[in-house]
Amino acid sequence: MKLVIVSGRSGSGKSVALRVLEDLGYYCVDNLPLPLIGSLLEQLKGSNDLVAISVDVRNMPEQDKVLVKQLASLPPDTELTSFFLNSSDKILLKRYSETRRLHPLSKSQVSLQEAIKLEGKLLEPMSKLVDHYIDTSNLNIYDLSDQVRQILLGSVDKELVINFESFGFKHGMPTEADFMFDVRFLPNPHWELALRPLTGLDEPVAEFLNRQPLVNKFIWQIENLLETWLPHLERNNRSYLTVAIGCTGGQHRSVYVAEQLAKRFSNGKHKVYARHRELNNAKA
């Protein structure tokens, strides 16, 4: 079982790191006391091989040797990776001032600045035991996400789920689309009597549309557009991308184009799906 422990000073980006881990398929638990890790791993054994927890200053033992003992008592088959996130006092003070959140160590007699300094002192033992120390003072959430992915995967690339959805404008436009393309200007198989009862999934319709230079040029240009901007969408922490292709009835042109685009992006780097709204509705 792989276990990732994320610790660090409040405001340094632990929640961002945990969200990245969740996107990578980890079962995530926020602010779990260290003595409970063993019980958690035992409960998840066999059902979850990827587990991540965040630990804040309120759940840390006061003595270094207790911390070392707790980490050493993990099950022998545990593959542990640990992160400590930190930022300068000045940056943490600025972040708390902007968000107006209450610091975990804030008390009526303790100022925010004093709480930040105290937390740094209490977490110092943990900062010396971790595998990866990341200073987030000059990082935005995207830079931090990239660093965490780089360490865990050896790459900053994020697995993006791409949905190509065909639809018919006469049945209404989909509301969840990130990109929407109108293909009603393309040659229409509907006017070929032999093709009218078929769909864009059928070979005769596919052959008809594949012979149309305008259709091939359109598919090529959409492919290039998406290839150009996909890396930027991935860096924006996007998990899903829905590309809607619409024709009049959602039976021929949009179905064919969606299928062709799905095939071109099914290269193993992304999870790609083709969905045909009107065809699915007709079956229901």
From Swiss-Prot:
Keyword tags: ATP-binding, GTP-binding, Nucleotide-binding
Domain of life: Bacteria
Binding site for ATP: 8-15
InterPro entries documented for this protein: P-loop_NTPase, RapZ-like, RapZ-like_N, RapZ_C
Residues noted as binding GTP in the record, renumbered to the chain: 56-59
GO molecular function, one term: GTP binding
Task of the protein: Displays ATPase and GTPase activities.
Annotated family: Belongs to the RapZ-like family.
Protein name: Nucleotide-binding protein Sbal_3671
Organism encoding this protein: Shewanella baltica (strain OS155 / ATCC BAA-1091)
